Amino acid sequence: MVNSPQNPRQDQRQDLDLTSFSATGGEPVEWRISDAPVPYPEAVAAMEARVAAIAAGEAPELVWLLEHPPLYTSGTSGKDSDLLDPRFPTFATGRGGQLTYHGPGQRVAYIMLDLKRRRPDVRAYVASLEELILKTLAAFNVRGERREDRVGVWVKRPDKGDGYEDKIAAIGVRLKRWVSFHGIAINVEPELSHFAGIVPCGVADPRYGVTSLVDLGQLVTMADVDVALRQAFEELFGPTRALVPEAAA
């Protein structure tokens, strides 16, 4: 989930204080949306460049919303044995976590924030990303929940049986010089069968599957989700400024 400086705190994430991530002063966070799918290597190169610029004080913070063409990514805890059917390109990545799928219909938000200026607390930052997802889902009357033993945000599925839950959003974070990158992925309307090519995030228990907003009966568009995501982000992290250009660097 996180590849970062060491942080010894062991509080449950739901109990962590999330109130101090809104920076005072400074520029609003740039908010950028790419309409066309962005190849993964291109996105990583752009993030790396932007993170270096933020750390050097040469660029403002950035949230970059995009979709990828179908692909799998493997985090620092990824296992080759969890790649069951490599039907799409697979990329090793420096973020925390294991294997996941990205593709059209999934809103990826790459979040590049200066945590040294805001609050250098890794676990609380991850909890704040969970809260960002929870608030976004709540805008569509979907109750997401944290799980201390499983990464991401989950929804209960009593229609499938007792104890069944589906993952609706993933989190994977990396830090360089206390600047965050990578981020979150919310399933809006992806092709859920593509997750069958992997063991998503290493969770093999058949009670735990994958879902999306549309799969749950919420007829929402990507634009709807973007509006809710931005509102939730500003509640947690402060003001944003929309940009038209698509390049993240």
UniProtKB/Swiss-Prot annotation:
Binding site for substrate: 95-102, 170-172, 183-185
Catalytic activity annotation: octanoyl-[ACP] + L-lysyl-[protein] = N(6)-octanoyl-L-lysyl-[protein] + holo-[ACP] + H(+)
UniProt KW Transcription keyword: no
All residue ranges annotated as the BPL/LPL catalytic domain in the record: 57-241
Assigned protein family: Belongs to the LipB family.
Domain of life assignment: Bacteria
Note: In the reaction, the free carboxyl group of octanoic acid is attached via an amide linkage to the epsilon-amino group of a specific lysine residue of lipoyl domains of lipoate-dependent enzymes.
Protein name: Octanoyltransferase
Organism: Bradyrhizobium diazoefficiens (strain JCM 10833 / BCRC 13528 / IAM 13628 / NBRC 14792 / USDA 110)
Sites marked Lowers pKa of active site Cys: 167
Pfam families linked: LplA-B_cat
Region Disordered, residue ranges: 1-23
